[in-house]
């Protein structure tokens, strides 16, 4: 009997939106590694030379095929581009909708157009072209209300009436649409990671390492907050476990799951491990920034944004995310998706640090940062 996450990829034809991104690109590779016949990558961002090479290598190694639709051909905001993706093969077996507008620095209209309307376009074409499975990449931020999350299950975290960020609000709207669309002809599920990391990450770890390398990062508050983290391979595995769990009468239908590495980690501790490994100054040797001070400054920044329209990097949402506990139970994903992490944090975090030391650090220094840190 196939292991969970390995059955649906075998011989499948899949669409992966967001295929030039951190998660989407790794999902494309892992689908081929698990026997997919063809993966249609869809992303408004064109693959860079490194990703082009990665895709060439995995195709040679597996015999699978990758069709890349990028630029105007990979635009979620274009009705014609989205529909064209569904015509690239006689039958699409599964759609993995990963693409999203992320971060706190965009306006409501853009978030809605990409994260909500883009999702509606995927749903409409799944129906039109009789795609039987849709796996939606959601976010735990769709459940955040501002307080600590300590070991909760997904069923203990309903979607709130108000949201901490536009990203969360529009991702939640997309998720609701995906679940509403679930029927015998189109089976759907939502799977979210928490704090995804790994090689080729361009957001989470590099941004924090850059700030630390310039000597601008301090521990927020006491620095004892714990979080769940998710290695990128574990998340892609969770998405494929989600696809495996899409069958009639499955408990996973129209349901939301969070997957991660397992036991929670002290956020500032593991981040400091990465910082020290890069040769940067140990955060524990610097004074901590008091939480109340940070919140006061963040609210002033938010008021400044309200007055001027200029967006600052420090805002109440980002401060809160770096100070609260954010860790989740795996119980539901283990039961319904048969998900188990491929690697633990103890295995995957050191691998990731080593990758950044070898691949990211030299490039960062070449950009004129060699005398910093």
Give residue ranges: language-model regions.
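Amphipathic terminal alpha-helices
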Residues: 2-7, 13, 328-336, 340, ...
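Mid/C-terminal beta-alpha module of Rossmann-like enzyme folds, strongest
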Residues: 245-313, 350-351, 363-373
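N-terminal Rossmann/SDR dinucleotide-binding element
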Residues: 1-94
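Conserved Rossmann-fold NAD(P)-dependent oxidoreductase catalytic core, especially the SDR/UDP-sugar
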Residues: 97, 121-167
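Catalytic helix-loop patch of NAD(P)-dependent Rossmann-fold dehydrogenases
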Residues: 113, 148-196, 217-220, 225
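Substrate-positioning beta->alpha
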Residues: 169, 173-174, 201-207, 221-245, ...
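Conserved C-terminal active-site "lid" loop/helix of NAD(P)H-dependent oxidoreductases
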Residues: 232, 239, 299-340
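NAD(P)H-binding glycine-rich loop region in Rossmannoid oxidoreductase-like domains
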Residues: 62-117, 121, 125-128, 142-146
């Amino acid at each position: 009997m196939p292991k969970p996450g390995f059955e649906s990829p075998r011989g499948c034809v899949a669409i992966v939106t967001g295929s030039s991104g951190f998660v989407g690109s790794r999902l494309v590779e892992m689908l081929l590694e698990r026997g997919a016949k063809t993966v249609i990558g869809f992303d408004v961002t064109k693959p860079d030379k490194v990703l082009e090479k990665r895709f060439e290598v995995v195709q040679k190694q597996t015999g699978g095929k990758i069709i890349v639709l990028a630029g105007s051909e990979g635009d979620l905001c274009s009705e014609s581009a989205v529909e064209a993706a569904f015509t690239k093969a006689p039958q699409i077996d599964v759609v993995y909708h990963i693409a999203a507008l992320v971060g706190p620095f965009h306006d409501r209209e853009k978030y809605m157009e990409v994260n909500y309307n883009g999702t509606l376009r995927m749903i409409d074409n799944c129906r039109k072209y009789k795609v039987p499975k849709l796996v939606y990449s959601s976010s735990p931020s769709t459940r955040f209300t501002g307080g600590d999350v300590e070991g909760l299950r997904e069923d203990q975290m309903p979607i709130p009436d108000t949201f901490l960020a536009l990203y969360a609000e529009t991702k939640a709207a997309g998720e609701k649409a995906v679940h509403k669309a679930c029927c015998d002809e189109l089976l759907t599920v939502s799977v979210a990671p928490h704090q995804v990391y790994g090689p080729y990450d361009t957001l989470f770890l590099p941004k924090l390492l850059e700030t630390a390398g310039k000597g601008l990062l301090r521990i927020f508050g006491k620095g004892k907050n714990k979080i769940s983290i998710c290695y990128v391979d574990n998340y892609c595995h969770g998405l494929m476990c989600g696809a495996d769990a899409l069958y009639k009468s499955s408990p996973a239908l129209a349901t939301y799951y969070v997957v991660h590495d397992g036991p929670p980690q002290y956020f500032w501790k593991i981040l400091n491990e990465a910082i020290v490994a890069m040769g940067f100054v140990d955060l524990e040797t610097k004074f901590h920034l008091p939480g109340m001070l940070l919140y006061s400054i963040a609210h002033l920044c938010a008021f400044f944004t309200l007055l001027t329209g200029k967006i600052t990097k420090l805002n109440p949402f980002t401060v809160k995310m770096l100070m609260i506990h954010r860790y989740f139970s795996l119980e539901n994903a283990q039961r319904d998706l048969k998900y188990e992490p491929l690697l633990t944090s103890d295995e995957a975090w050191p691998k990731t640090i080593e990758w950044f030391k070898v691949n990211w650090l030299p490039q960062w220094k070449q950009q004129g940062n060699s005398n910093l840190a």
